[in-house]
């Protein structure tokens, strides 16, 4: 059968979609570029916040409206787990596949191929036709025992010079605003050997940047009995990867960042001097209500240690604006913290009241108009900070991973890429005149700094390893 996968949400979902694609391809099914050409359309759903769930339902409705006779629609992933009844009730959905069961996509497709208009049951019942039973969420689930994602054979489909590598799934934290543990469960780490094998396969396929992702990256290996598991993994990873590769760390919660991890990042040439460190707020009372570590002074010391070990490090963080009870004083403390710390990159989320979370039941919910005003204040503040941080690079040479080419309206050719300071999809770009092959590293002298991007010109002197990517 021909299949097409639509991925919504975060990079972890992208990894799961690649896993489903590789499983289906290994079973003889054929990927196609457009949903209209597929016999089976898989939508890997997102349930992060209300807006993500609405987008998921919109996509399911859109695909269902275009379904042709004999075409099937499978809803997979987080929302299929967290809101299974709602997803099952969406018109045209033929099967559900939860976020913990994506590696059983082959069973689902084989079932649909073998018995038209059927879906699966989650309990001990046999496969049953939808036409003869209620279309409840249970009736749509895939049967059988849970298959562990950590050992599922995956052959990644390489589509560019960068790839995400998920090292764990689930989270042991219970932040007051977050629903993820309710459908992902506690953290489960992938074995070091399995990660090394996947990384080696990616490198052999030509991937130049491996981005490590997880719900809680710095907690990696705790369930395996490892101390400083992420640092240990990075040592092993850099031992097998060529020197001209990048390794990037995303979703690194600060209370898991140890002295050993900082030293490991500084020591290995492959590791980008970049850290995505979600903090969510800076005022201790707000953090307590969030069920987050409230020690902002420790965070300041940690940032100082990171910059002492890697003076060129680019730091990114994310914050939630309008959390219940956030007073004007607490908000001012956050803006003061941003001015003091000077992050290179910041993502800002408007608080979303998620049913079933402790935060949803808190008093003093902030009016939306106040959240919006504070969000714009933070964004304007950080825009200026990011511009100033970018200006430090004017006149300097920085290594760039080329991601594509283009041209201006007047026909001038240019290339687009990212430096070590820029994670895929969420950060800025480096643009420079001329053309360079996609997937190659080039050195660029920065000539202009914008709010989030850099402009420059390619220089001839190549760097001989990945170390210069962290700045010369």
UniProtKB/Swiss-Prot annotation:
InterPro entries the UniProt entry points to: Elp3/MiaA/NifB-like_rSAM, Methylthiotransferase, Methylthiotransferase_CS, Methylthiotransferase_N, Methylthiotransferase_N_sf, MoaA_NifB_PqqE_Fe-S-bd_CS, NA-bd_OB-fold, Ribosomal_uS12_MeSTrfase_RimO
Keywords: 4Fe-4S, Cytoplasm, Iron, Iron-sulfur, Metal-binding, S-adenosyl-L-methionine, Transferase
EC number: 2.8.4.4
Family annotation (SUPFAM superfamilies): Radical SAM enzymes
Cofactor: [4Fe-4S] cluster
NCBIfam families: 30S ribosomal protein S12 methylthiotransferase RimO (TIGR01125), MiaB/RimO family radical SAM methylthiotransferase (TIGR00089)
Protein name per Swiss-Prot or TrEMBL: Ribosomal protein uS12 methylthiotransferase RimO
């Amino acid at each position: 059968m021909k299949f097409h996968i639509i991925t919504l949400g975060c990079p972890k979902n992208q990894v799961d979609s690649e896993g489903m694609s590789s499983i289906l391809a290994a079973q003889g099914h054929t990927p196609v570029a457009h949903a209209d050409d597929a016999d089976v359309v898989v939508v890997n759903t997102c349930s992060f916040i209300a807006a993500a769930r609405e987008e998921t339902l919109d996509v399911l409705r859109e695909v269902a409206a275009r379904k042709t006779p004999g075409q099937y629609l499978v809803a997979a992933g987080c929302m299929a787990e967290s809101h299974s009844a709602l997803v099952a009730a969406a018109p045209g959905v033929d099967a559900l596949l939860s976020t913990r069961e994506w590696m059983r996509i082959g069973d689902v497709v084989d079932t649909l191929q073998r018995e038209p208009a059927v879906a699966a049951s989650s309990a001990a019942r046999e496969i049953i036709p939808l036409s003869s039973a209620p279309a409840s969420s249970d009736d749509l689930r895939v049967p059988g025992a849970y298959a562990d994602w950590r050992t599922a054979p995956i052959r990644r489909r390489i589509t560019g010079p960068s790839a995400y590598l998920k090292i764990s799934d689930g989270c042991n934290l219970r932040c007051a605003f977050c629903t993820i543990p309710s459908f992902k469960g506690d953290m489960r780490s992938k074995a070091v050997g399995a990660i090394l094998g996947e990384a080696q396969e990616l490198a052999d396929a030509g991937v130049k940047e491996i981005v490590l992702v997880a719900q809680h990256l710095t907690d990696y290996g705790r369930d395996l009995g490892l101390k400083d598991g992420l640092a240990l993994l990075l040592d092993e990873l850099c031992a097998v990867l060529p020197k001209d590769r990048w390794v990037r760390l995303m979703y690194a919660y600060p209370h898991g960042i140890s002295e050993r991890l900082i030293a490991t990042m500084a020591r290995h040439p492959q590791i980008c001097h970049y850290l995505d460190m979600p903090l969510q707020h800076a005022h201790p009372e707000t953090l307590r209500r969030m069920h987050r570590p409230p020690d902002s002074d420790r965070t300041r010391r940690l940032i100082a240690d990171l910059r002492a070990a890697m003076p060129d490090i680019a730091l990114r963080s994310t914050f939630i604006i309008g959390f219940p009870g956030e007073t004007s004083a607490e908000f001012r403390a956050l803006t003061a913290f941003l001015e003091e710390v000077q992050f290179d990159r910041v993502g800002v989320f408007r608080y979303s009241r998620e049913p079933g979370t402790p935060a949803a039941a808190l008093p003093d919910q902030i009016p939306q108009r106040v959240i919006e005003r504070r969000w714009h204040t933070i964004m304007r503040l950080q825009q200026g900070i990011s511009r100033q941080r970018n200006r430090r690079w004017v006149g300097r040479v920085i290594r760039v991973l080329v991601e594509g080419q283009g041209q201006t309206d007047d026909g001038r050719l240019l290339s687009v890429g990212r430096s070590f300071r820029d994670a895929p999809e969420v950060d800025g770009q480096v643009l420079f005149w001329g053309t360079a092959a996609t997937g190659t590293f080039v050195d660029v002298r920065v000539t202009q700094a914008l709010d989030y991007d850099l402009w420059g010109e390619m220089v001839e002197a190549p760097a001989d390893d990945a170390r210069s990517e962290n700045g010369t």
